[in-house]
From Swiss-Prot:
Enzyme class at the top of the EC tree: oxidoreductase
Stated family: Belongs to the MurB family.
FAD-binding PCMH-type domain: residues covered: 29-205
Organism: Mycobacterium leprae (strain TN)
Co-factor(s): FAD
Substrates-to-products reaction catalysed: UDP-N-acetyl-alpha-D-muramate + NADP(+) = UDP-N-acetyl-3-O-(1-carboxyvinyl)-alpha-D-glucosamine + NADPH + H(+)
Role, per record: Cell wall formation.
Gene: murB
A Pfam family reported for this protein in Swiss-Prot or TrEMBL: MurB_C
UniProt-recorded name of the protein: UDP-N-acetylenolpyruvoylglucosamine reductase
Coiled-coil blocks: none
Length: 367
């Protein structure tokens, strides 16, 4: 590590020491990192990670965390000697109907730029916090759209070899909130490859992608499968997200979260039929490639966990707007979050026999 009059540097990237990671995540929990290395360019990302991964790379014995927007992370408060690499390579380029975003680009900035250029396909994903590089990892989706609908290829740094290459979408094994990246590293703490850049192929007709999500279709007074003005779709999506506490607002503790903490479980058809016999009234469900997708929020509420649970002054509670969001009420720790998540997951399992899976990366902690 080199020092100069303007600070310390590692492989050309700026280094800060003894940095609290909590303010760098949307959940606002986490440890103090021994150092945070901020990479302002893709070249710095490659050089820094190659050097840290080398046998004598100067990383030390502590763990390594690679992150960008910090919107899908729960980092244990107890992690010691942590080196964090923060991706701040934020370039966005547009060539015809192709949009390329570097990993550290703010995701909503990518959506806005695409819409400003008359390109449709990303508007349903408006308002999602985080970075562009995180989107293919869990195949980010909302309101009837997923990034796998438009991703054509991803540029990667393969950590075992140090090589950089473009990988086509067909190699990424996209599924519901998953990809080859998540399948290789379920915890999100030791990725075998680092996303450097993502390319999207969008619709240059000036129309949105076809609308299928019922709540959004109704808001726009449209019909299922209809296309609309991407600007109008974006505004409708943002309004829906605000109502659910899913647009970041420093003054609103309902937004101090990782978004939906649990994915919607996909179960076998016979499991769905048994569930439908157990309860009064309809069970929200949707067709899925491998079975029937259930609504995790419905399961959570029917298991006895309502909005704002637990009542009182608990530092971590379910959002008052959306039961799938576990929120930091101002003084929560990662352990508080994990404890509540475990309580909810175990409660759903006890009532319905269904295990909910966490959506965020759990670094140094387990449910």
């Amino acid at each position: 590590m080199k020092r100069s009059a303007v600070g310390s540097f590692f492989a050309g990237a700026h280094v800060a020491e003894a940095v609290s990671l909590a303010p760098l995540t949307t959940l606002r929990v986490g440890p103090v990192a021994q150092r945070v290395i901020t990479c302002a360019s893709t070249e710095q990302v490659v050089d820094v990670i190659r050097q840290l991964d080398a046998p004598a790379g100067g990383r030390g014995a502590g763990p390594l965390l690679i992150f960008a927007g910090g919107s899908n992370l729960v980092i244990a408060d107890t992690l010691a000697d942590l080196t964090a690499v923060r991706l701040a390579n934020a370039g966005i380029t547009i060539d015809g109907n192709l949009v390329r975003a570097e990993a550290g680009a703010v995701w909503d900035d990518v959506v806005v730029r695409a819409i400003e250029h008359g390109l449709g396909g990303l508007e349903c994903l408006s308002g999602i916090p985080g970075s562009a590089g995180a989107t293919p990892v869990q195949n980010v989706g909302a309101y009837g759209a997923e990034v796998s609908d438009t991703i054509t290829r991803v540029r990667l740094l393969e950590r075992s070899s140090g090589s950089v290459r473009w990988v086509s979408a067909c190699e990424l094994r996209f599924g519901y909130r998953t990809s080859v990246f998540k399948q290789a590293d379920p915890s999100g703490s030791q990725p075998p490859a680092v996303v450097l850049e993502v390319e999207f192929k969008l619709d240059a007709s000036g129309q949105s992608a076809p609308l299928h999500y019922g709540e959004l279709v109704a808001t726009l007074d449209a019909t299922s499968g209809q296309r609309a003005n991407p600007h109008a779709v974006r505004e409708a999506v943002l309004a829906l997200r605000v109502r659910k506490g899913m647009v970041l607002d420093a003054a609103d503790h309902d937004t101090w979260s990782v978004g939906s903490f649990f994915t919607n479980p996909v179960v076998a058809p016979d499991v769905y039929r048994q569930l439908a016999k157990m309860v009064d009234g309809p069970v929200p469900h949707y067709p899925a490639q491998d079975g029937v997708k259930l609504a995790a929020g419905w399961l959570v509420e029917r298991a006895g966990f309502g909005k704002g649970y637990p009542d009182g002054a608990a530092p971590c509670r379910l959002s008052t707007k959306h039961v799938l969001a576990l929120t930091n009420r101002g003084a929560a720790t990662a352990e508080d979050v994990v404890t509540l998540a475990r309580t909810v997951r175990n409660g759903v399992l006890e009532v319905f026999g269904i295990t909910l899976e966490p959506e965020p990366a759990l670094v140094g902690c387990v449910l």
